[in-house]
A protein has these predicted regions:
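Thiol-based oxidoreductase modules, predominantly thioredoxin-like and allied folds used
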Residues: 31-42
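Non-catalytic, surface beta->alpha helical segment in thiol-disulfide oxidoreductase systems
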Residues: 60-83
């Protein structure tokens, strides 16, 4: 099963919105979600800083700030074709 990772911050409204979109898409598209909070992790804060939420599909960068459902579905399909 595909793994979607979302790097988030606590009390981040964009992060909450992105996570909600992913949860809705998961029902139809069948993937797992792993949410990682970057708060307090110096390396992740340097890497992602103000770009959160950052989404990865199977470990590869997908997008940041928002999850566009159409773009996400397209990217997930491309990942599945190359597996």
């Amino acid at each position: 099963m595909d793994l979607v990772t979302i790097y988030s911050r606590k009390e981040c409204h964009l992060c909450e919105e992105a996570f909600t979109v992913l949860q809705k898409l998961r029902a139809d598209l069948k993937f797992e979600i792993n949410e990682i909070f970057i708060d307090g992790d110096e390396d992740l804060e340097k890497l992602y800083g103000e770009q959160v939420p950052v989404t990865l599909i199977n470990g590869e960068h997908h997008d940041y700030w928002k999850v566009n459902p159409v773009r996400f579905k397209s990217s997930l399909e491309k990942h599945r074709q190359h597996q």
